[in-house]
Swiss-Prot record:
Keywords: Ribonucleoprotein, Ribosomal protein, RNA-binding, rRNA-binding. This is Large ribosomal subunit protein bL9. GO terms for molecular function: rRNA binding; structural constituent of ribosome. GO terms for biological process: translation. One of its GO terms (cellular component) is ribonucleoprotein complex. It comes from Bacillus licheniformis (strain ATCC 14580 / DSM 13 / JCM 2505 / CCUG 7422 / NBRC 12200 / NCIMB 9375 / NCTC 10341 / NRRL NRS-1264 / Gibson 46). InterPro entries: Ribosomal_bL9 (IPR000244), Ribosomal_bL9/RNase_H1_N (IPR009027), Ribosomal_bL9_bac/chp (IPR020594), Ribosomal_bL9_C (IPR020069), Ribosomal_bL9_C_sf (IPR036791), Ribosomal_bL9_N (IPR020070), Ribosomal_bL9_N_sf (IPR036935). SUPFAM superfamilies: L9 N-domain-like, Ribosomal protein L9 C-domain. It holds the Pfam family Ribosomal_L9_C. Belongs to the bacterial ribosomal protein bL9 family.
Length: 149
């Protein structure tokens, strides 16, 4: 019996795959537990429609990530912090602070987890910070930390 997998089933198939399995296994386990549906022509066309929709959404996501990259690379995020001798900060500037500054100063919402700050910024001056917006799109954000008055 041909079935369309709705979820990954270890050793049998991945979500969205159409496979031939034993009738009893299909009826008594896969379909009963909601892991698969019978591969009728209506179900197959619905699956194809869903795949097209997912592909379109992925393309839109990539396009918006590229637009955001363009915006991020044109701006400089200004932050102020208390510092001691030699421009060393008391504490550090974190990815959360950078994300908040982007939200407040430039109305750009970037998840703090996408800001790839290996080590927190601990000194005054300019720092280039990589931002991974999408698996295929990475921007470089300029962050300027200045003395707090």
């Amino acid at each position: 019996m041909k079935v369309i997998f709705l979820q990954d089933v270890k050793g049998k198939g991945k979500k969205g795959e159409v496979k031939n399995v034993a009738d009893g296994y299909a009826h008594n386990f896969l379909i009963k537990k909601g892991l698969a549906v019978e591969a009728t022509s209506a179900n197959i066309s619905a699956l194809e429609g869903q795949k097209k929709k997912e592909k379109k959404e992925a393309a839109e996501e990539l396009k918006s990530a590229k637009e955001l990259k363009k915006q991020l690379e044109e701006i400089t995020v200004e932050l102020s912090a208390k510092s001691g001798e030699g421009g060393r900060l008391f504490g550090s500037v974190t990815s959360k602070q950078i994300a908040d500054a982007l939200q407040k100063g430039h109305q750009l919402k970037v998840d703090k987890r996408k800001i790839e700050l290996n080590d927190a910024i601990r000194s005054l001056g300019y720092t280039n910070v990589p931002v991974k917006l999408h698996p295929e799109v990475q921007a470089t954000l300029k962050v300027h930390v200045k003395e707090q008055s």
